[in-house]
Amino acid sequence: MTVARVNINPDVLMWAIEYSQRGLEAFSEKFPKLTKWLEKSERPTVKQLEDMAKFAYVPFGYLMLSEKPDIPIRKISDFRTLQNQGFIASDEYSAALRDTINIVRSRQEWLIDYKKDKDYAPVAFIGSIDRNMSDDDIVNHINKVLEIPTNWRTKISSRANALRFFVDILESKGIVIFINGVVGNDTHRPLSVSEFRGFALADKMAPVIFINGADAIAARIFTLFHEVVHLFLGQDGLDDRTEPFCNRIAAKLLVPEDLFDKGWQKYAHDFEQLEKFFKVSQLVLFRAALTYNKIDEKEYARLVKLYESTHKRISMTGSGGDFYNVAPYRVGRGFCRYVNEAINSGALTYTEAYNLLGVKGKTFAEVMKKAKEG
């Protein structure tokens, strides 16, 4: 039986190799006949081309094109990086980060159109602060809008519960939150905490926060508030002033100065004891101590370096854990509710919903059920 072979453009294959960022050597090892395909001395089979598409993280149809596809990298200029190492140029994004951005932007764009079509009101607080306001006024404004109980620290038993508590509040205010440690639902493609911890996409109709679920739970809480400040600014851009500003305000929201002063009087420099009370990581407390002039930049850097070298990150939404428990956070619980609403109103087909969430059939039904349960 003759095996069907496919005519391909070698330039398209090279584009896929470059797009994947895996490198030519990895492809040559995976596909021993790659050189012959590139030289056009032999043609790949349909199965071989399908396997290559999967390996390159591109749709199979792209490899059948006569010309290289023009796929722009959808840039984001705000990333909370590990110790805020700075701006990441779009041409430096890893394939995993690039694909994550595309997934999140696609979901946001759908939600913007859906909410406009259904006459949803904009989220009023997006862009409601600016850096000319005093820190106290900003903190008071954000607390008033979000309605976070002042006694939350005494009511919540763990940092994992604290994260869920804050996600619930933010989702109730119209912010869509995704927490994921992998690309989509592909557990073979983990996200790197050293590359980014989170990002925000400011839009009055559908503000979005993405948190890298590969990070430690306590670190995610600070990232969440850091990105909240970006949304209140109404921007997802980064400059030399914005990141320190967002860090400072996030620290003040999580660790108010009056409470920190009381804790410091009792446990000065004992960050383990402070951590137990504030329900936030020592990294956040280091930031608060710096913000409130209890330590200087040099001591802050030393503490962070020591902490990072001795604490392992634990992921709830990475490759581990029960899929049905983590999936609602990966695809966004609040986002799932909009999708369910759209299906019930006839504005979205099940096939379209499957594509939006990256799950289908019984898996889709179970994920939607878990998202509804919260």
Describe each region flagged by the PLM.
Residues 1-374:
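Active-site hotspot residues in diverse enzymes, especially metal/ion-binding acidic/histidine motifs
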